[in-house]
């Protein structure tokens, strides 16, 4: 079965993102296809490369990045939600005159069209 995941919670502070990550791992272990993860609202904080968890905590931002690198899962970030929350890539930082970017490699700023496409092409869309 082909799945897409929508994450609306931040990397830390709620259970949404970590539950989504564990679900994503379980899908892959069980042989399902995870085509994409779409980060929306507070979920865009999962792509902030400046996140620095305590040494005894799982680094969820890098966990998502590894999921992308090892399994080719697209990590799409809602561009409007990201810009409102200060998560920007180099292109947007330059366009907006910001000093630097902070989008973790492996993540892509995209519009709601990426979510719509996932909804149309996947058997299931699961939101956390």
Swiss-Prot record:
GO terms for biological process: tRNA wobble position uridine thiolation. Its EC number is 2.8.1.-. Keywords: Cytoplasm, Transferase, tRNA processing. It is found in: Cytoplasm. One of its GO terms (cellular component) is sulfurtransferase complex. NCBIfam families: PRK00207.1, sulf_tusD_dsrE. Heterohexamer, formed by a dimer of trimers. The hexameric TusBCD complex contains 2 copies each of TusB, TusC and TusD. The TusBCD complex interacts with TusE. Part of a sulfur-relay system required for 2-thiolation of 5-methylaminomethyl-2-thiouridine (mnm(5)s(2)U) at tRNA wobble positions. Accepts sulfur from TusA and transfers it in turn to TusE. This is Sulfurtransferase TusD. The lineage of its organism: Bacteria, Pseudomonadati, Pseudomonadota, Gammaproteobacteria, Enterobacterales.
């Amino acid at each position: 079965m082909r799945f897409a995941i929508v994450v609306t919670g931040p990397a830390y502070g709620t259970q949404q993102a970590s539950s989504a990550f564990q679900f994503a791992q379980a899908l892959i272990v069980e042989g399902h296809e995870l085509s994409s993860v779409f980060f929306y609202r507070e979920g865009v904080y999962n792509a902030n490369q400046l996140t620095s968890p305590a040494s005894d905590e799982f680094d969820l931002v890098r966990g998502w990045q590894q999921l992308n690198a090892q399994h080719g899962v697209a990590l799409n970030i809602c561009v409007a939600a990201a810009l409102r929350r200060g998560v920007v890539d180099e292109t947007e930082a330059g366009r907006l005159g910001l000093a630097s970017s902070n989008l973790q490699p492996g993540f892509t700023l995209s519009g709601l069209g990426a979510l719509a496409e996932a909804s149309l092409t996947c058997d299931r869309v699961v939101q956390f």
